[in-house]
Regions:
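Structural motif
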Residues: 113-122
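Short conserved catalytic/interaction loops centered on acidic-Pro-aromatic/His motifs
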Residues: 137-147
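Short, hydrophobic/amphipathic alpha-helical patches that form generic packing surfaces
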Residues: 63, 122-135
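Conserved short "hinge" loops at termini or chain/domain junctions
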Residues: 1-113, 147-171
Length: 171
């Protein structure tokens, strides 16, 4: 069956922003109780060490996604952008991102692209927060890992969506 390509770019700056926002809100919630130490450890900051650790967690999440979605992803030699373009640059920049190039049948439902894009982003954010909390707030880490893993079946389902063939059109 004929194939087509879809590309989804996940921006690193947006990932860092969402991670910072979610961890800030979690620390504020913890602070409303008597958990001041947990609140201080829960939030991320802009220190080089913190960004470096989060960046490594983001890389791990992207690598896991590539393994899970491998049957849809082009080989590395065919799609140049699929390689880790951030390999040696730890600094957070808005322009840089991870490009997922998927090979899908022509009858793939393009209505699923927004959901897939959002789910990939959410998976990476939840996985990175889970990794962060594994070091700073172990009680919360498993909840974020579960949220990340819970997105995978939904991503698989969205990747399997197809449109019906109509008479007079080619596949």
């Amino acid at each position: 069956m004929a194939k087509t390509e879809i590309r989804i770019t996940i921006k690193v700056g947006e990932l860092f922003y969402d991670i910072a926002t979610k961890t800030y809100l979690a620390s504020r919630t913890a602070m409303s109780g008597d958990k001041y130490e947990e609140a201080a450890d829960a939030a991320t900051d802009k220190s080089e060490e913190c960004e470096n650790e989060l960046y490594r967690s983001i890389q791990s999440a992207v690598a896991k996604l590539r393994v899970h979605l491998g049957k849809y992803i082009y080989g590395y030699e065919e799609a140049k952008e699929i390689n880790n373009i951030l390999k040696n640059d730890v600094r957070r920049t808005e322009e840089k991102g991870y490009v997922f190039a998927f090979s899908v049948p022509y009858n793939f439902s393009v209505a699923s692209i927004d959901f897939i894009s959002t789910s990939l982003h959410d998976y990476i954010v939840n996985y990175a927060i889970g990794s962060w909390y594994l070091k700073t707030n172990a009680d919360e880490a498993s909840a974020y890992y579960k949220m990340a893993e819970g997105l995978l079946p939904q991503i698989y389902e969205a990747m399997s969506k197809r449109t019906r063939h109509r008479r007079g059109t080619m596949f």
